[in-house]
């Protein structure tokens, strides 16, 4: 079976989408021979990459979605259930060419991302952040060397041209194309969610709570499979390895998890610089505290942090591609900020975490519950950070029964087998479609 998927990064970089597809591919291969075809959409062109039973193509090798599917000829196409321009182009082409389409809930820890403070996210702030992002000279996954004038805006226009050319290839009415163009730009300006894609042949959902949402859009129950979240499989197997570090002398080892608030247009360059200088400066005041940092694996620049450390005279280690679970047992406490799926992972594994308040950002799923269970402590002022670290270091923490109940409520079948269930559903759908075509 040839399965086509899309990514914003070459899959040697391990973002959430890449991890999702790798989990599915691993589960599929246990059942049937499966070739995973990647199409990467990014501004820079690259040559085709071959890796065992995976092939990686550049979006710029194709004129539009129809051209792409004709050349790659997949058996199935896996796309999100929202209409992102490139992947929606593939779904339009798939409908025209008769190639089956499977929708998935997205490469997220959970679709209900935010906790109780979500109402604090103002639409005005989101709109401003959206346009700040568009005017940036880099995409989130770019290095400093890739920075070019309005690179992000120009690539946004490239994606939309690709989408328009696909619509013309499938003979969509020109007035409808214009209407959709206008609607999408209004949605972008207001930071509205991408439109729901109701034209897919089957849907893989994270949990039962999503079923009603899909049926609201007219998706019949027979087109839906609730499989759980494949991203959680790896977390399920790794959280049992998380341990408390053995105390050595009076030293406290801190690992700082940064957040790409600047790269996503929420912070300005100066805001990021000021926050980090204040954070590092405060930690340096206590000689018993040693710290290193873990930056985002794809969206943050290691070069930036190396330059900042040199400017501040810091010798801390900078981790980027390393797995969270390979690092945290070497540290007593995690210090973090912003809004990140990493916060949900830290909640799940019960690692001592201090969350520094930043603006009025919401919390991700399960973080509020972890705060209530005292697995996560909040810091609202840098003046309180050092005493909080020492107090938390002496405290013993355990997963409470109430916390475990909430975890099981939020995550459908948190058992490490979601990838297998998704693979079983994909294969069953594939065989059904194949028998119909024969």
Model regions: which residues?
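N-terminal pre-catalytic "stem/leader" segment of glycosyltransferase-like enzymes
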Residues: 1-133, 139-154, 263, 268-269, ...
């Amino acid at each position: 079976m040839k399965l086509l998927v899309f990514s914003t990064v070459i899959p040697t970089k391990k973002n959430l989408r890449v991890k999702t597809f790798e989990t599915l591919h691993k589960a599929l291969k246990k059942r049937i021979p499966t070739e995973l075809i990647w199409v990467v959409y990014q501004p820079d062109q690259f040559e085709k990459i071959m890796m065992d039973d995976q092939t990686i193509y550049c979006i710029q090798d194709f004129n539009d979605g129809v051209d792409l599917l004709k050349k790659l000829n997949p058996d199935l196409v896996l796309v999100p259930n929202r209409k992102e321009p490139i992947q929606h182009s593939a779904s339009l082409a798939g409908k025209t060419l008769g190639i089956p389409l499977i929708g998935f809930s997205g490469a997220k820890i959970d679709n209900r991302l935010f906790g109780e403070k979500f109402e604090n996210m103002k639409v005005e702030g989101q709109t401003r952040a959206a346009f700040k992002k568009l005017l940036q000279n880099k995409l989130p996954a770019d290095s400093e060397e890739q920075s070019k004038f309005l690179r992000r805006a120009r690539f946004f226009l490239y994606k939309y041209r690709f989408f328009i050319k696909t619509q013309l290839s499938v003979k969509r009415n020109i007035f409808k194309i214009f209407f959709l163009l206008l609607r999408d730009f209004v949605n972008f300006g207001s930071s509205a969610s991408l439109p729901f894609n109701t034209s897919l042949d089957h849907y893989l959902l994270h949990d039962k709570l999503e079923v009603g949402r899909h049926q609201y859009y007219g998706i019949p129950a027979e087109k839906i499979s609730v499989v759980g979240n494949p991203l959680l499989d790896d977390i399920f197997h790794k959280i049992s390895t998380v341990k408390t570090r053995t105390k050595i002398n009076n030293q406290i080892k801190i690992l700082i998890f940064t957040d790409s608030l600047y790269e996503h247009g929420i912070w300005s360059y100066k805001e990021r610089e000021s926050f980090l200088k204040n954070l590092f400066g405060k930690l340096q005041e206590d000689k018993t505290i040693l710290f290193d940092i873990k930056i985002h694996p794809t969206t943050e620049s290691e070069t930036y942090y190396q330059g900042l450390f040199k400017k501040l005279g810091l010798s801390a280690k900078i981790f980027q591609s390393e797995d969270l679970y390979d690092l945290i047992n070497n540290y007593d406490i995690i210090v973090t900020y912003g809004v990140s799926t990493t916060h949900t992972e830290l909640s799940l594994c019960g690692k001592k975490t201090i969350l520094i308040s930043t603006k009025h950002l919401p919390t991700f799923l399960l973080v509020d519950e972890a705060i209530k269970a005292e697995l996560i402590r909040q810091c609202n002022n840098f003046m309180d950070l050092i005493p909080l670290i020492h107090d938390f270091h002496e405290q013993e923490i355990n997963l409470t029964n109430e916390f475990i109940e909430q975890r099981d409520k939020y995550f459908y079948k948190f058992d490490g087998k979601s990838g297998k269930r998704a693979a079983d559903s994909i294969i069953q759908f594939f065989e059904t479609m194949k028998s119909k075509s024969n």
